[in-house]
C-alpha cells in the first residue's frame, strides 16, 4: 500500500468528488489547521455536537443505545466536560474509491491539550460524513472549535481493487449524514 500525496488527493477531490467541500490548501492562520496537506487532508468538525451526560443515569450500551445519553448542541465552540466524550461529524462528505483505505489520525494541537479524536478506517467504497469521537482526557473542561481542523485523513492505495467494497456489503454506516449513533444489526 502506498500513502497518496497531495496531487492525487486534489485530483480525486476535484474530478471524482472524493471530498466535498474541498479546501485545496492548508488554512492555519488563527485557526486549528484544515485542508490539503502533503500526504493527507485535515477535515473540519461541523457545528453540531452530541455531548454525553449522566443527567438521566443512562447506561452506554452499543447494542441498545439510548438517546438519553447525551444532549444536542449547535454551537461554534463545544465545551467537553472533564473526562467526558462528544460525538460530532465532519463538514466534508467523503466518497472513498474501491482501491483505497483511509485512516485517521488526531491533530497535534488538540492532542497536546488532552483531546483525543477517534475514527475507525474509512473502507473502500464507503461514503458519507464521518462521525468523529472526541475524548477529553483531562480533569478540566476542553474546547472544540467548529469549522476548524479536527483530524487528518491519510489515503492508502491498494495494489488492486478489493473484491467486496463497503458498499457491496451494504455496510450499516453507508451514506451517513451528520452524526450517526452506534448501530448493531
From Swiss-Prot:
This is dCTP deaminase. GO terms for molecular function: dCTP deaminase activity; nucleotide binding. InterPro entries: dCTP_deaminase, dUTPase-like_sf, dUTPase_trimeric. Belongs to the dCTP deaminase family. NCBIfam families: dCTP_deam. Coiled coil: none annotated. The gene is dcd. Pathway: Pyrimidine metabolism; dUMP biosynthesis; dUMP from dCTP (dUTP route): step 1/2. Its EC number is 3.5.4.13. Keywords: Hydrolase, Nucleotide metabolism, Nucleotide-binding. GO terms for biological process: dUMP biosynthetic process; dUTP biosynthetic process. It holds the Pfam family DCD. Homotrimer. It catalyses: dCTP + H2O + H(+) = dUTP + NH4(+). HAMAP family: dCTP_deaminase. The active site is at 133 (proton donor/acceptor). DCTP binds at residues 107-112, 131-133, 152, 166, 176. Disulfide bonds: none annotated. The keyword Cell membrane does not apply. Catalyzes the deamination of dCTP to dUTP.
Amino acid at each position: 500500500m502506498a500513502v497518496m500525496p497531495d496531487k492525487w488527493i486534489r485530483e480525486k477531490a476535484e474530478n471524482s468528488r472524493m471530498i466535498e467541500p474541498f479546501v485545496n490548501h492548508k488554512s492555519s492562520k488563527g485557526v486549528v489547521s484544515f485542508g490539503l496537506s502533503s500526504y493527507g487532508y485535515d477535515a473540519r468538525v461541523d457545528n453540531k455536537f452530541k455531548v454525553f451526560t449522566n443527567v438521566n443515569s443512562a447506561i452506554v450500551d452499543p447494542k441498545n443505545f439510548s438517546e438519553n445519553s447525551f444532549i444536542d448542541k449547535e454551537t461554534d465552540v463545544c465545551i467537553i466536560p472533564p473526562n467526558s466524550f462528544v460525538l460530532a461529524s465532519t463538514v466534508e462528505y467523503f466518497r472513498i474509491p474501491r482501491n483505497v483505505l483511509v485512516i485517521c489520525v488526531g491533530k497535534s494541537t488538540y492532542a497536546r491539550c488532552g483531546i483525543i479524536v477517534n475514527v475507525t478506517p474509512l473502507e473502500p467504497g464507503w461514503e458519507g460524513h464521518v462521525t468523529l469521537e472526541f475524548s477529553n482526557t483531562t480533569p478540566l473542561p476542553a474546547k472544540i472549535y467548529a469549522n476548524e481542523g479536527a483530524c487528518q485523513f491519510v489515503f492508502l492505495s491498494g495494489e488492486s481493487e478489493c473484491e467486496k467494497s463497503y458498499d457491496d456489503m451494504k455496510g450499516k454506516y453507508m451514506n451517513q449524514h451528520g452524526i450517526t449513533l452506534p448501530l448493531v444489526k
